[in-house]
Amino acid sequence: MYQQMIFVNLAVSDVAASKKFFTELGYTINPQFSSDDCASVVISDTIVAMMLSKEHYAKFTQKEIADATKTSEALICLSAESREKVDELVDKAVAAGGTAGKTQDYGTMYGRAFDDLDGHSWEIMWMDPSEVQG
């Protein structure tokens, strides 16, 4: 069965630093789709974050590239299998140079956020499986 994929493309100041940051979070880099101008960060079988140098990113848009440290361009939210996994990933991000964001605890839903090296906002959320199945 076909599984649709998502490729999140983000402009970054330093591709090598982004590669290091995301590998420290436990993700892998797909060398087939990576270069000096781009890092293909494999989040899962169906989610890939493409970290593009600003020069390379500019080839795909006529719009001004947002400075994610000053404006919000998107909120990228990833699921986690447990509250502990939420904390683990965000703690790794902060240890790797990211900035901790807001924590949200609603009992059956728990999340924390971080900004990566370029200010892109990532939210990591866990939801109680019994609540999701309804």
Predicted feature locations:
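N-terminal beta-strand motif that seeds the catalytic metal site of vicinal oxygen chelate
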Residues: 1-17, 73-78, 128-134
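Residues that flank catalytic or metal-binding motifs in active/ligand-binding sites
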Residues: 4, 37, 45-47, 72, ...
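Core segments of cupin and vicinal oxygen chelate
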Residues: 9-57
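Membrane-topology and secretion signals of cell-surface/extracellular proteins
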Residues: 22-25, 67-69, 124-129
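Vicinal oxygen chelate
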Residues: 40, 90-134
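Short beta-strand/turn micro-motifs at beta-sheet edges
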Residues: 61-66
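Mid-chain, well-packed structural core segment of small domains
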Residues: 70, 74-91, 97-98
